[in-house]
Structure formats: structure tokens, C-alpha cells
């Protein structure tokens, strides 16, 4: 909270925060050797939203990590839906030689990872659509970066909402 408070006092800060989640399930995070819990992640998000009411929270979510059960995946999916993200990069775990997870039991099949990816991507899209609906009708400063087509300019708001202007 102290660091977030200092950030909130900065005039030149764009309120878009990328916080890598990896999984919304505590058991999966422990197997990944991550040193945070979903509850701690949620608390950080709540603190950011309190300090920056219109901030965008983006993340990375992995599906199909070694040993991820259907129940654990369900927890992660529910967490992503609950937290409400502006955007999420969803990817499937891929086994890599020499890593700790290489020899772990419970490797998830390619087909199952594809199924889980599709479900997680859909949840992420729903969160993104809800975030974007909240931006509609707002008057915002936009940094236009390029002309996309004749008469069409492309840029971003302070919270990294993509804007096209004709």
C-alpha cells in the first residue's frame, strides 16, 4: 500500500499495471514455485484499483502446468473471472528439458491444454469486454502514435485503452 500510495501521487504515471498471475490456484502456484497466493494477488489489485479507480490490470495466465487438475484449472478460471482484467495473455505450459517441471507427474495432454486455453481465453475476453464497456463515453486524453489509414488515427489513453479516431 505504501508504494502504491507514492505512485498515486505522481502526476506522470499511466495507470496500466501488468501483474503476472500465472495461475489463480494456490496449489498450482506452489508447484510453479511462485511466492504469492491468489489472495495476495487480489489484495494488490484491490489496492491499485482503490488508488487508481480507472486503472487497467493486465496479466499472463498459464494453463496445463504439470499436475494441474480439472479442479485446479476451475479455480484458476473462476479467479480470472472474479478479478476482472483489462487484458490477459493466455498460454499453455510446454514441457522443457532441464526444468524442474520436466519430470513432474501429471503432465496434461496437448488436447486438454487446448481445451483449457480456449476456456481461459474466453474468460479473458469477457473481462476485457467489460473493461472496455466501462471506458465508453468517457472523455480521455489520447496519445496518438500513428495514422492507421487515411483519416484514421491510432493511439492510447493513460490506462492503455486502444483508440481509433476518424
Give the location of each predicted region:
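Conserved non-cysteine loop/helix-boundary elements of the Radical SAM core domain that shape
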Residues: 1-87, 93-112
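Terminal RNA-binding accessory module
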Residues: 103-166
Amino acid at each position: 500500500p505504501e508504494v502504491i500510495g507514492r505512485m498515486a501521487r505522481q502526476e506522470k504515471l499511466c495507470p496500466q499495471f501488468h501483474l503476472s498471475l500465472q495461475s489463480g490456484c494456490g496449489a498450482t502456484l506452489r508447484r510453479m514455485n511462485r511466492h504469492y497466493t491468489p489472495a495476495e494477488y487480489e489484495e494488490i489489485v484491490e489496492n491499485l484499483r482503490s488508488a487508481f479507480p480507472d486503472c487497467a490490470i493486465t496479466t499472463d495466465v498459464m494453463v496445463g502446468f504439470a499436475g494441474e487438475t480439472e479442479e485446479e484449472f476451475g479455480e484458476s478460471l473462476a479467479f480470472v473471472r472474479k478479478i476482472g482484467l483489462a487484458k490477459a495473455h493466455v498460454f499453455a505450459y510446454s514441457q522443457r528439458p532441464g526444468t524442474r517441471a520436466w519430470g513432474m507427474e501429471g503432465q496434461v495432454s496437448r488436447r486438454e491444454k487446448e481445451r483449457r486455453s480456449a476456456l481461459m481465453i474466453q474468460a479473458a475476453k469477457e473481462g476485457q469486454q467489460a473493461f472496455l464497456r466501462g471506458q465508453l463515453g468517457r472523455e480521455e486524453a489520447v496519445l496518438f502514435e500513428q495514422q492507421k489509414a487515411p483519416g484514421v488515427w491510432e493511439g492510447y489513453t493513460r490506462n492503455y485503452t486502444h483508440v481509433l479516431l476518424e
